[in-house]
UniProtKB/Swiss-Prot annotation:
Pyrroloquinoline quinone binds at residues 273, 363, 430-431, 539, 560, 563-564, 621. Residues 211-242, 659-689 are annotated as: Disordered. Residues 219-238, 659-678 have a biased composition (Pro residues). PDH consists of three domains: an N-terminal cytochrome domain (found in AA8 family enzymes), a PQQ-dependent dehydrogenase domain in the middle of the sequence, and a C-terminal cellulose-binding domain classified as a member of the family 1 carbohydrate-binding module (CBM1). The N-terminal cytochrome domain has an electron transfer function, i.e., intra- and inter-molecular electron transfer between the cytochrome domain and the catalytic domain and also Fe (III)-reducing ability. This function is essential to activate lytic polysaccharide monooxygenases (LPMOs) at the cell wall. Residues 679-689 have a biased composition (Low complexity). One of its GO terms (cellular component) is extracellular region. Transmembrane segments: none annotated. This is Pyrroloquinoline quinone-dependent pyranose dehydrogenase. Residues 1-18 form the signal peptide. Its EC number is 1.1.99.-. Belongs to the sugar dehydrogenase AA12 family.
Amino acid sequence: MRSSSLAWALGLVALANAQGSPTQWYDSITGVTFSRFYQQDTDASWGYIFPSASGGQAPDEFIGLFQGPASAGWIGNSLGGSMRNNPLLVGWVDGSTPRISARWATDYAPPSIYSGPRLTILGSSGTNGNIQRIVYRCQNCTRWTGGAGGIPTTGSAVFGWAFHSTTKPLTPSDPSSGLYRHSHAAQYGFDIGNARTTLYDYYLQQLTNAPPLSGGAPTQPPTQQPPTTTAPPPPPPSSTFVSCPGAPQPRYQMNVANGFRVAPVLGGLTMPRGITLDTRGNLLVVERGRGLTGHTLDANGCVTSSKVVIQDTQINHGIDVHPSGRRIIASSGDIAWSWDYDPATMTATNRRTLVTGMNNFYHFTRTVHISRKYPNLFALNVGSDGNIDVPTRQQNSGRAQIRVFDYDQLPQNGVPFVSQYGRVLGYGLRNDVGITEDRAGNIHSIENSLDNAYRMVNGQRRDIHTNNPAEKVYNLGDPSNPRAIFGGYPDCYTVWEPSDFTDSPKQPGDWFTQDNSGQYTDAWCNANAVKPTLLLPPHTAPLDMKFGLGNDTNLYVALHGSWNRQPPQGYKVVVVPGQYSASGEWSPTAPLAQSRTAWSDLLTNRNENQCSGFGNANCFRPVGLVWSADGQNLYVSSDTSGEVFIIKRMSGPIVQPPITQPPITTSPPTPTTPPVVQPPTTVAPPQASQTLWGQCGGQGWTGPTLCPANSVCRESNQWYSQCVPA
């Protein structure tokens, strides 16, 4: 036993050597920001998020992250810096299953199971073949008896880290398994205050709802052809959902794609427009002419109760909830306001003016989007003041553009839309009502394009408006670094139907001007305007779009329909296949020129030809979209019919709940308790030869001593040698 304790002790000597400090790190897998310590030699990370402190007190919990190479054996930490008399957390991935447990050591010897902390494994844990990660919630974790005594509310703290580069625990399927001694260990300090955030509850929800990390090919998007002709058979239903009790029957007959069901959840509303969910899963609906209403939902996603959250007839479209859940922003045609919000009671108080001076009488709806990556930033759109609004060639017109504002920098009484506080994300965007954000934090917008389009050919005005121009999606980029992207309006439009152009060859996605002469020509547009990433059919009037959650990488678009086309088209929700880059940036699967067939119907009216862009429209007209947190339910508002629908994915949720391990009941060891694991000096690892960073020698070592190619066995001390790059 003496040699065992001494080996663990000398292995922890490195804890006296600080190895840098954590920094703020954006996790592109989940969109969550951690305070992360990164250890370059092992390519491993330890991340932390702590809840904010109120009155000098903070909840006794935190969110943690272990991440390292898939080949690593285990990753661990000491919450008090040193190994002895402080909680030790150890995690690893067993096949594809993440494991974690709490340990305690009173001596430099193999630690025993510790029953104090309550550990819950959260989403995005697992392995993809390259990395393994364990994201966890640690409750009852910041105060203990002995050692450091706890994690301070503010100021500096010292944490320890430990890592085994190759060998899993003795019984990987058992969270309580004995461990081989670490191959690396050290200590670092950081300011706990920098790791505390008011977004803790939001981040916890995001991580709880995140899918497991897994390898293999990504799930294929739906076929690009309409599901009525080419979609595969629907999966077996995992739900018996048919309709919501007490909800009205739909006003119009509808078709829904295979694998989904649709039913109303609300009816008789006053022009429902923008919709969203708060952090407790309540449905918020802007009813034009009434205000903001809130609706609690049951386990099936059906409404159980409703109330008025904000009584205000000025609010007409835009609504968003801050990621913290404690603030909402909504807008009239002229002013954007914020309210303090309590999701537990669905109450809004303390209205504050944020942005003014947005009024025009042509396009009078304003969309609000609060960045998920940068929650202090919010975007607002202002459409053109006319079908063709010539002054919008200039950014300072304050129309046909989207601007970004920093909430934390705004004066108490608000600012004009065209003030220096509003940075231009994009301009030359005729009326981009739909705004959304991808997993990299980039903002995408979708445009309602020109009515009554024509083309001058040999001095003759030729009507091309039935099938041109296309509606389109722009990637406007990072809202923290606005680039003032120019979308081409009021001169440049996008070809949908090339055969309408007899004076020059065209393909879908090409630029055209109505009068291809003078300064603003097709060539000028090619040289000066940024092309969209995606096209949709003309006069479908897209009003909202949302990306799928989890492994669903599609884009979902609400097409409101327009008065400016016969026969009518739109009046539906469509799906566009896409993919994410390694950084989380979304792009459509099909190239721009193939956009005409790169979408399929999700929800349609039974007879689109009876729809109208006037009055009650004779059909439902989709406006707003929002997904439930588990990715199973898509809510759709329809203004002219006064309804909100639920489109339910019958295969079930696609964002899985967290894996919660059973509580550990073993008591903490006393000083006389013998170690529960035999030391590694008497148990040989299973490998015949060692891997990079693995132990290859040392006094009493009986394991593999042969290192892989291009590495050597280097002595760290009398008891430990390691395979390192040559």
